[in-house]
């Protein structure tokens, strides 16, 4: 049986990044991560195949994130740089440039419609098309179509900026 501690150790940073794709506010993002962890903990006994843990966890994460977005609809947003972008770095100019590019990408991903945001965040977490399909309840072909459309939209958004 997989423990919650193992899930957090293996997927904690990925869960934080997924939450960051849906929530800018740090406190609400942290609440979302906690909500995801509680949901995973409650669902772990129903996991039949431990080899499918990754898509199992990510499906729960995305379902909770979608519910969170629905609850927060209409809430005024706050601009806060993602924790994953607060990285002291090499030379200050390069670090600033990298952070600005990463911030633009994060903001562009946040502007994607929900179906495209879901697949892109899972692609960024290195899930295969098959794992994404399983996590989101889609066909592999539909995942491919959504990824291509999301990439095209991101490219357009980033080239306009």
Task: Report each predicted region and the residues it spans.
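Structural recognition of an alpha-helix C-terminal capping motif at a helix-to-coil junction
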Residues: 31-38, 42, 51-63
């Amino acid at each position: 049986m997989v423990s919650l501690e193992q899930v957090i150790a293996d997927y904690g940073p990925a869960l934080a990044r997924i939450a960051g794709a849906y929530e800018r506010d740090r406190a609400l993002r942290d609440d979302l991560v906690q909500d995801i962890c509680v949901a995973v903990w409650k669902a772990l006994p129903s996991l039949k195949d431990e080899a499918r843990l990754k898509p199992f966890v990510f499906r729960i994460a995305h379902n909770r994130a979608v519910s969170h977005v629905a609850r927060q609809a209409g809430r005024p947003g706050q601009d806060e740089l993602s924790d994953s972008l607060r990285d002291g770095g090499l030379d200050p100019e390069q670090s600033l440039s990298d952070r600005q590019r990463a911030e633009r990408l994060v903001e562009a991903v946040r502007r994607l419609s929900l179906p495209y945001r879901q697949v892109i965040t899972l692609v960024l977490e290195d899930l295969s098309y098959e794992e994404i399909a399983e996590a989101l309840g889609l066909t592999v072909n539909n995942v491919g179509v959504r990824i291509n459309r999301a990439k095209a939209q991101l490219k357009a958004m980033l080239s306009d900026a």
